[in-house]
Regions:
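Fe(II)/2-oxoglutarate oxygenase catalytic core
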Residues: 1-182
Length: 182
């Protein structure tokens, strides 16, 4: 059998009144971000309710998951159907709401990953994503999974390490060489 990529259905994810939560305390976010050595912070309730619900529905309904990753999760990218008016609105609002962080950097890529809950089982072949580094001037990650689906209530689902990848490492090293990363 030959794998063929065919977008069978792309859900609706149109622009909303305000994609990024209007109640966010921008000053506090800036303070936390710029007080960290590497420019790092986290924000709860990042998206507004309407944007969050629309994005969840879009990702659940759309057949845009064309890349099967090692570890048993699926990937979707802008060029393969992830692009939508809402995704582009979020990118635009990030630039206008956080100009001191985003600066003049352009959006280069957006991706989404869909995980299998079996990844939390230590004896499962489904492991999810390994420790890695993302290559970006500014990297923004957000999780849109419903809280009740989180299998570890003490965690938000993502671990961010307080370490910068060495400048002499290649993309392959900081994404695939687990023994050197650890």
């Amino acid at each position: 059998l030959v794998n063929s990529i065919k977008l069978l259905h792309q859900g609706e994810a149109g622009r909303v009144n305000q994609a990024i939560n209007g109640a966010l305390d921008t000053s506090s976010i800036y303070d936390k971000y710029f007080s960290h050595e590497f420019g790092l912070t986290y924000v709860d309730n990042f998206l507004g309710t309407e944007a969050l619900e629309s994005l969840r529905k879009f990702l659940l309904e759309s057949t845009i998951w064309f890349e099967q990753k090692t570890g048993g999760y699926l990937g979707a990218y802008l060029n393969d159907g992830l692009a939508s008016p809402l995704i582009l609105q979020i990118a635009s609002e990030l630039k206008s709401r956080f100009p001191l962080i985003i600066k003049d950097h352009a959006l280069n890529q957006v991706w989404a990953y869909k995980y299998d809950s079996r990844a939390s089982d230590p004896v499962s072949d489904v492991t999810g994503i390994n420790i890695h580094a993302d290559f970006a001037a500014v990297n923004i990650n957000f999780w849109i999974t419903q809280s009740e689906a989180n299998l570890d209530s003490e965690s938000g689902g993502m671990v961010v390490y307080n370490t910068e990848a060495p400048k002499d490492w290649s993309f392959d090293t900081y994404n695939n060489n687990l023994s050197r990363i650890q």
